[in-house]
């Protein structure tokens, strides 16, 4: 792809990476553009390697690039893991996450689309990395409620201690989803917000 761009009239590449390049969870500090890269699965490693190719191929050329690392991308028509949650909600199956007080960043597909458009439109935004997310983070329980509300459904949730959920998930062979469901993954998107304000596009991050 980069070689094709170098041989074309394309002026800028906006590469959609993933927050998985930084890791699967955060502790005290949210991920930012200066955070260490620590991918924990093949998908994250692949995105990290692709970012490296983009930088190495285009950095010293006359082509510009933007790398964006989004977290979970949200829309009313949910896909992937969120679609699985929606199907559970539709079946009125109670979910045991009411007492999980984690915080996870998401980005609305509209917010992400508007920020991509900003990067394409403004020629002075070049060779940058952005972490793009909504200003508000959600607990797993709040995200489930949001999915239900946006689809005109009611969700049933009850409390199960976190340690018990961890044990159950490991026993049933779902240990890989522990971080996704129970731990924090927060993003500091202040750099992206700053650039949006700089170019008078404040409404991009007004949607929570």
Regions found by a protein language model. Give the residues of each.
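Glycine-rich Rossmann NAD(P)(H)-binding loop
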Residues: 75, 97-102, 130-137, 148-150, ...
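Non-catalytic, hydrophobic alpha-helical segments
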Residues: 112, 116, 132, 143, ...
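Substrate-positioning beta->alpha
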Residues: 78-84, 97-121, 127-128
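Short-chain dehydrogenase/reductase
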Residues: 29-32, 40-51, 72-75, 79, ...
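C-terminal amphipathic/interface module of NAD(P)-dependent oxidoreductases
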Residues: 146, 156, 176-208
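Conserved beta-loop-beta element that borders a ligand/cofactor-binding pocket
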Residues: 52-76
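Mid/C-terminal beta-alpha module of Rossmann-like enzyme folds, strongest
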Residues: 118-176
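Conserved Rossmann-fold NAD(P)-dependent oxidoreductase catalytic core, especially the SDR/UDP-sugar
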Residues: 2-42, 58, 66
């Amino acid at each position: 792809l980069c070689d094709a761009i170098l041989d074309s009239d394309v002026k800028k590449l906006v590469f959609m990476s993933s927050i998985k390049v930084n890791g699967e969870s955060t502790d005290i500090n949210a991920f930012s553009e200066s955070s260490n890269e620590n991918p924990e699965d093949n998908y994250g490693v692949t995105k990290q390697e692709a970012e490296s190719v983009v930088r190495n191929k285009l950095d010293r050329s006359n082509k510009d690039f933007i790398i964006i690392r989004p977290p979970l991308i949200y829309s009313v028509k949910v896909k992937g893991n969120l679609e699985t949650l929606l199907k559970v909600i539709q079946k009125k199956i109670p979910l045991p996450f009411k007492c999980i007080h984690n915080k996870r960043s998401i980005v609305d597909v509209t917010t992400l689309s508007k920020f991509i458009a900003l990067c394409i439109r403004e020629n002075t935004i070049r060779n940058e990395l952005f972490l793009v997310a909504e200003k508000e983070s959600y607990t797993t329980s709040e995200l489930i409620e949001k999915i239900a509300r946006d689809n005109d459904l009611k969700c049933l949730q009850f409390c199960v201690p976190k340690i018990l959920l961890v044990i159950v998930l490991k026993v049933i062979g779902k240990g890989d989803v522990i971080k996704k469901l129970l731990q924090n993954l927060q993003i500091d998107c202040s750099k992206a917000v700053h650039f949006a304000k700089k170019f008078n596009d404040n409404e991009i991050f007004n949607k929570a």
